[in-house]
Regions:
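Polyanionic (Asp/Glu-rich) segments that form extended negatively charged tracts
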Residues: 1-98
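Intrinsically disordered, low-complexity N-proximal targeting/linker segments that flank membranes
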Residues: 118-183
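Short secondary-structure subsegments characteristic of cysteine-rich extracellular domains
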Residues: 103-118
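Short, low-complexity intrinsically disordered segments
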Residues: 86-88, 111-113, 158
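Short, solvent-exposed secondary-structure capping/transition elements
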Residues: 98-106, 122-124
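Residues that form generic nucleotide/phosphate-binding pockets
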Residues: 68, 92, 113, 134-141
């Protein structure tokens, strides 16, 4: 992973934010609700970011995450058209583990979420906004319930019958839907 990937994942884990610019704001003591600088927020912001970085860099966590990704069929990095999808999946993995979710739930939800992101294209365009919205919902109602709601609303019969087949008709060699099919 690049340093940008590391900062993005740590930001999602520590602050539930997808934009890199939010890291600077958090570490500067900016209160996201009031938009005022509060110096007393700085130590906690640094502690949260450090904790996220330590979890992210733990070899055990990274290898466990790679095992989950490979069990979903993604055995080669060339099967990914979006590093942002992988970043979100790793952040989700770390968040669920920190929340005490069982290994079987983490494995299932992370696999399904990764495939859903790649099939629907949620990791392209203004993905930071979608990721932040998803992270907020995960904090409020849990990852499994949030995923089930997203699957129900986005992976409809119309998606499978019309949207996905039309996305598969592409001459691009980095078509995310086709690469997901290969996985």
């Amino acid at each position: 992973p690049s340093y940008v990937d590391i900062i993005r994942v740590a930001s999602m884990v520590a602050y539930r934010r997808g934009r890199i610019s939010h890291v600077v704001r958090e570490l500067s003591g900016l209160n996201p609700e009031t938009r005022k600088f509060e110096p007393e927020r700085v130590p906690a912001a640094f502690d949260s970011f450090e904790d996220a970085l330590l979890q992210l860099m733990r070899e055990y966590n990274f290898k466990k995450f790679l095992t989950i990704v490979q069990s979903a069929g993604f055995v080669d990095k060339r099967l990914f058209s979006s590093v942002n999808a992988v970043n979100f999946a790793y952040a989700l993995f770390l968040i669920m583990r920190a929340q005490g979710a069982s290994d079987s739930e983490v494995n299932s939800v992370v696999r399904r979420w990764l495939v859903m992101i790649l099939l629907t294209g949620r990791a392209s365009g203004s993905f930071e906004t979608a990721f932040e919205r998803d992270l907020d919902r995960i904090d409020r109602q849990g990852a499994a319930k949030t995923l089930a709601e997203i699957e129900e609303s986005e992976l409809t019969d119309a998606f499978w019958e019309f949207s996905l087949p039309s996305r598969l008709v592409s001459s691009s060699v980095i078509n995310p839907q086709y690469l997901t099919f290969l996985a």
